[in-house]
Curated annotation (Swiss-Prot):
Sorted UniProt keywords: Ribonucleoprotein, Ribosomal protein, RNA-binding, rRNA-binding, tRNA-binding
UniProt xrefs under Gene3D superfamilies: 1.10.8.50, 30s ribosomal protein s13, domain 2 (4.10.910.10)
Molecular-function GO terms, alphabetical: rRNA binding; structural constituent of ribosome; tRNA binding
Database matches in Pfam families: Ribosomal_S13
Single GO cellular component term: cytosol
SUPFAM superfamilies per record: S13-like H2TH domain (SSF46946)
Subunit structure, interactors included: Part of the 30S ribosomal subunit. Forms a loose heterodimer with protein S19. Forms two bridges to the 50S subunit in the 70S ribosome.
Keyword Ligase: no
S-S bridge residues: none
Residue ranges, annotated region (Disordered): 98-124
Name listed for the protein in its UniProt record: Small ribosomal subunit protein uS13
Family: Belongs to the universal ribosomal protein uS13 family.
Job description of the protein: Located at the top of the head of the 30S subunit, it contacts several helices of the 16S rRNA. In the 70S ribosome it contacts the 23S rRNA (bridge B1a) and protein L5 of the 50S subunit (bridge B1b), connecting the 2 subunits; these bridges are implicated in subunit movement. Contacts the tRNAs in the A and P-sites.
C-alpha cells in the first residue's frame, strides 16, 4: 500500500483511480500527474516501484494543493465570505444553498431534515 500526501492508496486499484482517493485530485488531475511523471495509468498500485511512488509524491507535493492545505484554503475562503457579510457569506452562515437554487421546496441537503411545526392545543 503506497502512502502519498498522508493517504494510503488501495493497492489493488489502478493508479489513475487510486490517486482520486486524495482530497483535491480527481480523474483529470490524476491523468495530468501520471502524464507528467511518466507512470503507466493502467498499472496497479501494488506493482509500482519505489522510484515511481517517489516521483508521484514529489509531483503532487510541488505542484498541487491537496488534503489539509486545500481544506484549510476552502474553509478560509468561506470564513472570509462570512466576515465581509456578502450574500454568499450570509447563505453559508444560515446553512442555505449558496448558488441560487430554489428553497421553497427541496434544498434538503443544505437545510437538513424537516423541522415540523405543529399547532398548539388550546387549554380548557
Amino acid at each position: 500500500m503506497a502512502r502519498i500526501a498522508g493517504v494510503d492508496l488501495p493497492s489493488n486499484k489502478k493508479v489513475e483511480i487510486a490517486l482520486t482517493y486524495i482530497y483535491g485530485i480527481g480523474r483529470t488531475t490524476s491523468k495530468k500527474i501520471l502524464q507528467a511523471t511518466g507512470v503507466d495509468p493502467n498499472k496497479r498500485v501494488k506493482d509500482l516501484t519505489e522510484e515511481e511512488i517517489s516521483k508521484l509524491r514529489e509531483e503532487i507535493e510541488n505542484n498541487y494543493k491537496v488534503e489539509g492545505d486545500l481544506r484549510q484554503e476552502v474553509a478560509a475562503n468561506i470564513r472570509r465570505l462570512i466576515e465581509i457579510g456578502c450574500y454568499r457569506g450570509i447563505r453559508h452562515k444560515r446553512g442555505l444553498p449558496v448558488r441560487g437554487q430554489r428553497t421553497r421546496c427541496n434544498a434538503r441537503t443544505r437545510k437538513g431534515p424537516r423541522k415540523t411545526v405543529g399547532a398548539k392545543r388550546k387549554e380548557k
